[in-house]
Design a protein with these regions (language model features):
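Charged structural interfaces that engage phosphate-rich ligands
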Residues: 1-152
Length: 152
């Protein structure tokens, strides 16, 4: 079976510089120009320069565990690093009431399999709009039925 790195090939942004603030989120963030769904094969180009302090984003989690490659779409209006740290805590604490915590607490999964990237910078500060964009990407990437975005 192919690895997630093969399935979700990305081009790394060469001019990206981590925030240099001893950020605990940056090691988990993949900085890319494109994201590819491991289920549908759809490729999305990233629409704006982004980093861990970017707000109003749709983001994409990939499980890098060989043979798994499941993905999750989420949104945040806060700084991206704040949301990343929450996901990391869910995983490290085995919080199975949260989708990412549940997935990464499965047998042979752990925090080293967690990768996250910004999928889209939403250009308007409208809660209803960002929620709709999140739903569109969940449908587009089939993350509800064949991904980590499952209802508990």
């Amino acid at each position: 079976m192919m690895s997630c790195q093969t399935i979700s090939t990305v081009r790394i942004v060469k001019d990206y510089k981590p925030c240099n603030k001893a950020c605990s989120a940056c090691p988990y963030i993949t900085h890319t120009k494109t994201i590819k769904s491991s289920v549908t094969g759809i490729i999305v180009n990233i629409n704006a320069p982004v980093d861990c302090s970017t707000t109003w984003v749709i983001y994409f989690v990939t499980c890098l565990k060989r043979g798994c490659c499941m993905q999750y779409v989420g949104k945040t209006e806060r700084e991206f690093r704040t949301r990343v740290k929450e996901h990391v805590r869910y995983i490290e604490n085995g919080n199975v009431s949260q989708a990412t915590g549940h997935h990464f607490s499965q047998r042979n999964h752990n925090i080293t399999d967690f990768s996250i990237a910004i999928l889209e910078k939403v250009q308007t500060c409208d809660t209803l709009y960002i929620e709709e964009r999140e739903r569109e990407f969940i449908r587009k990437f089939n993350c509800k039925y064949r991904g980590i975005n499952r209802s508990y």
